[in-house]
């Protein structure tokens, strides 16, 4: 009130969180508004943070998610630009390529899309164990891992990043009317990256910011 500045808290959906997908976030906010005597204050001061990595793992397109939240009067407080790691699994040797990212430090929620549908695991270690036990079922499957590889990274096939989610999100924001959300680069895995992906920290951060500025 003294400064006239609007303060908002952005809640961040994440796989295996209290709510983690587009519809779950909408149900959560509808529940808050329905129970509140002042729902307009919720809409003014409470909103969501959108992480491109999280929704790449959930396989929900940026335009679908961001449009749905907008249509339901949920404030978009912040957008976090981050990559997920993607891999096409053709055999056990591809699982071995992913083992280097099972660092034991962070949780790396993993989704597997195969011919029977999609599966979600709380950590890469769980997904790798499943892959070893059910090698035939996961043949020719697509894996997406909550592992924030640098925005500028171009891993060797069959590994790749989900940078198309960053590009689609950026394009959506450019066409969006009204106040824009706070933008943030969300890579935090510098200390646990495989050695061949590491460069000096200041150079890594500078390259990421340059990547966003030149989208």
Identify the role of each PLM range.
Residues 9-12, 82-84, 185-188:
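Acidic carboxylate-rich catalytic motifs and surrounding loops in phosphoryl-/glycosyl-chemistry enzymes
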Residues 11-15, 50-52, 149, 187:
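Short glycine-centered, acidic/aromatic-flanked micro-motifs in structured strand/loop junctions
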Residues 16-24, 160-165, 197-207:
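Alpha-helix N-cap and loop-to-helix initiation/capping positions
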Residues 26-30, 39-178, 196:
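Active-site capping/gating regions of soluble enzymes
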